[in-house]
Protein backbone atom coordinates (compact mmCIF):
# COMPACT_ATOMS: atom_id res chain seq x y z
CA UNK A 1 0.00 0.00 0.00
CA UNK A 2 2.86 2.36 0.82
CA UNK A 3 4.35 1.70 -2.62
CA UNK A 4 1.14 2.81 -4.35
CA UNK A 5 0.97 5.96 -2.20
CA UNK A 6 4.61 6.72 -2.94
CA UNK A 7 4.07 6.28 -6.70
CA UNK A 8 0.97 8.52 -6.62
CA UNK A 9 2.80 11.19 -4.61
CA UNK A 10 5.77 11.11 -6.98
CA UNK A 11 3.44 11.34 -10.01
CA UNK A 12 1.68 14.32 -8.48
CA UNK A 13 4.96 16.09 -7.72
CA UNK A 14 6.14 15.54 -11.29
CA UNK A 15 2.81 16.52 -12.89
CA UNK A 16 2.21 19.82 -11.05
CA UNK A 17 4.94 21.79 -12.87
CA UNK A 18 3.59 20.65 -16.23
CA UNK A 19 0.09 21.91 -15.39
CA UNK A 20 1.48 25.24 -14.17
CA UNK A 21 3.16 26.04 -17.48
CA UNK A 22 1.41 28.47 -19.79
CA UNK A 23 0.34 26.90 -23.03
CA UNK A 24 0.06 29.06 -26.12
CA UNK A 25 -3.21 28.92 -27.95
CA UNK A 26 -3.48 27.73 -31.49
CA UNK A 27 -2.54 30.13 -34.25
CA UNK A 28 -5.57 32.11 -35.42
CA UNK A 29 -6.70 31.15 -38.90
CA UNK A 30 -5.09 33.15 -41.65
CA UNK A 31 -1.97 33.66 -39.56
CA UNK A 32 1.42 33.66 -41.12
CA UNK A 33 4.05 31.41 -39.61
CA UNK A 34 7.04 33.31 -38.25
CA UNK A 35 9.22 32.24 -41.18
CA UNK A 36 6.79 33.85 -43.66
CA UNK A 37 7.35 37.30 -42.16
CA UNK A 38 9.09 39.29 -44.90
CA UNK A 39 12.83 39.51 -44.36
CA UNK A 40 12.81 43.09 -45.67
CA UNK A 41 10.39 45.75 -46.74
CA UNK A 42 9.50 46.66 -50.31
CA UNK A 43 12.02 48.06 -52.75
CA UNK A 44 11.48 51.63 -53.96
CA UNK A 45 9.08 51.84 -56.92
CA UNK A 46 11.20 52.19 -60.07
CA UNK A 47 8.61 51.34 -62.74
CA UNK A 48 5.73 53.58 -63.74
CA UNK A 49 3.74 54.01 -60.53
CA UNK A 50 0.29 52.47 -60.29
CA UNK A 51 -2.29 55.27 -60.42
CA UNK A 52 -4.07 56.10 -57.19
CA UNK A 53 -7.59 54.65 -57.37
CA UNK A 54 -10.31 55.35 -54.79
CA UNK A 55 -11.70 51.77 -54.81
CA UNK A 56 -8.69 49.72 -55.85
CA UNK A 57 -8.89 45.93 -55.76
CA UNK A 58 -5.84 44.47 -53.96
CA UNK A 59 -6.93 40.84 -54.29
CA UNK A 60 -4.25 39.76 -56.76
CA UNK A 61 -5.25 36.07 -56.59
CA UNK A 62 -8.32 34.12 -55.49
CA UNK A 63 -8.34 33.84 -51.70
CA UNK A 64 -6.06 36.84 -51.15
CA UNK A 65 -7.33 39.77 -49.08
CA UNK A 66 -8.63 42.90 -50.77
CA UNK A 67 -6.24 45.08 -48.76
CA UNK A 68 -2.50 45.71 -49.13
CA UNK A 69 -0.70 42.47 -48.25
CA UNK A 70 2.51 40.56 -48.76
CA UNK A 71 2.56 37.61 -51.17
CA UNK A 72 5.93 35.92 -50.84
CA UNK A 73 8.38 38.74 -51.57
CA UNK A 74 5.81 40.97 -53.29
CA UNK A 75 4.29 43.85 -51.33
CA UNK A 76 0.93 43.96 -53.13
CA UNK A 77 -0.35 47.54 -53.21
CA UNK A 78 2.98 49.27 -52.53
CA UNK A 79 3.35 50.49 -56.09
CA UNK A 80 2.01 54.06 -56.26
CA UNK A 81 5.47 55.62 -56.01
CA UNK A 82 6.90 58.58 -54.15
CA UNK A 83 4.41 61.13 -55.46
CA UNK A 84 1.32 59.50 -53.92
CA UNK A 85 -0.40 62.49 -52.24
CA UNK A 86 -2.04 60.23 -49.61
CA UNK A 87 1.36 59.68 -48.01
CA UNK A 88 2.84 63.17 -48.20
CA UNK A 89 3.99 64.62 -44.87
CA UNK A 90 5.06 68.27 -44.73
CA UNK A 91 7.53 67.59 -41.90
CA UNK A 92 8.69 63.97 -42.08
CA UNK A 93 9.94 62.45 -38.83
CA UNK A 94 8.61 65.38 -36.78
CA UNK A 95 8.61 63.11 -33.70
CA UNK A 96 11.99 61.53 -34.42
CA UNK A 97 12.86 58.31 -36.18
CA UNK A 98 12.01 54.85 -34.91
CA UNK A 99 15.13 53.01 -33.76
CA UNK A 100 13.59 49.89 -32.20
CA UNK A 101 14.51 47.58 -35.06
CA UNK A 102 13.10 46.52 -38.39
CA UNK A 103 12.26 43.28 -40.12
CA UNK A 104 11.57 39.72 -39.12
CA UNK A 105 13.95 39.79 -36.14
CA UNK A 106 11.81 42.44 -34.42
CA UNK A 107 8.25 41.21 -33.83
CA UNK A 108 6.18 43.50 -31.58
CA UNK A 109 2.90 42.76 -29.77
CA UNK A 110 0.35 45.58 -29.94
CA UNK A 111 -0.46 46.95 -26.49
CA UNK A 112 -3.70 48.82 -27.15
CA UNK A 113 -5.32 51.77 -28.83
CA UNK A 114 -6.64 51.87 -32.36
CA UNK A 115 -5.78 53.29 -35.78
CA UNK A 116 -5.72 56.89 -34.50
CA UNK A 117 -3.11 56.04 -31.86
CA UNK A 118 -1.70 52.68 -30.89
CA UNK A 119 1.38 51.52 -29.02
CA UNK A 120 3.77 48.72 -28.31
CA UNK A 121 6.82 48.60 -26.06
CA UNK A 122 6.38 52.28 -25.08
CA UNK A 123 6.41 53.55 -28.69
CA UNK A 124 3.36 55.37 -30.08
CA UNK A 125 2.09 55.34 -33.67
CA UNK A 126 -0.87 56.24 -35.85
CA UNK A 127 -2.18 54.75 -39.09
CA UNK A 128 -2.30 56.85 -42.27
CA UNK A 129 -5.80 58.20 -42.87
CA UNK A 130 -5.82 56.53 -46.30
CA UNK A 131 -5.11 53.12 -44.71
CA UNK A 132 -7.52 53.08 -41.76
CA UNK A 133 -10.02 50.82 -43.57
CA UNK A 134 -7.22 48.32 -44.27
CA UNK A 135 -6.69 47.54 -40.58
CA UNK A 136 -10.34 46.77 -39.81
CA UNK A 137 -9.59 43.24 -38.57
CA UNK A 138 -6.56 44.10 -36.44
CA UNK A 139 -6.59 43.14 -32.76
CA UNK A 140 -5.12 46.28 -31.21
CA UNK A 141 -4.34 44.66 -27.87
CA UNK A 142 -2.72 41.43 -29.03
CA UNK A 143 -1.72 41.21 -32.72
CA UNK A 144 1.94 40.93 -33.57
CA UNK A 145 3.39 43.41 -36.04
CA UNK A 146 6.73 44.01 -37.73
CA UNK A 147 7.89 47.50 -38.74
CA UNK A 148 9.69 48.29 -42.01
CA UNK A 149 10.92 51.65 -43.34
CA UNK A 150 8.89 52.92 -46.31
CA UNK A 151 11.38 53.59 -49.13
CA UNK A 152 9.01 55.82 -51.12
CA UNK A 153 7.23 57.96 -48.54
CA UNK A 154 9.50 59.89 -46.13
CA UNK A 155 8.11 59.97 -42.60
CA UNK A 156 6.11 56.75 -43.01
CA UNK A 157 6.81 53.19 -41.97
CA UNK A 158 4.98 50.00 -42.90
CA UNK A 159 3.42 47.91 -40.13
CA UNK A 160 3.02 44.27 -41.20
CA UNK A 161 0.39 42.29 -39.28
CA UNK A 162 1.80 38.79 -38.71
CA UNK A 163 -1.60 37.17 -38.12
CA UNK A 164 -3.26 38.58 -41.24
CA UNK A 165 -0.32 38.99 -43.63
CA UNK A 166 -1.45 42.57 -44.37
CA UNK A 167 0.21 45.95 -43.87
CA UNK A 168 -0.59 49.63 -43.45
CA UNK A 169 1.36 52.89 -43.50
CA UNK A 170 2.10 54.15 -39.99
CA UNK A 171 3.70 57.28 -38.57
CA UNK A 172 5.97 57.15 -35.53
CA UNK A 173 4.74 59.50 -32.78
CA UNK A 174 7.57 58.94 -30.30
CA UNK A 175 7.86 57.49 -26.82
Predicted features along the sequence, with ranges:
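Low-complexity segments
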Residues: 55-175
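Extracytoplasmic low-complexity, disordered linker/stalk tracts in cell-surface/secreted proteins
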Residues: 1-87
Amino acid sequence: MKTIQLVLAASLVLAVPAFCQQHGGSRPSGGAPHNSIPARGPAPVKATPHPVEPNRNYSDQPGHPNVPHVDGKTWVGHDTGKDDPRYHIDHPFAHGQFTGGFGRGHVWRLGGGGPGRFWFNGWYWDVAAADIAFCDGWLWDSDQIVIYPDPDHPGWYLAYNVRLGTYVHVEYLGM
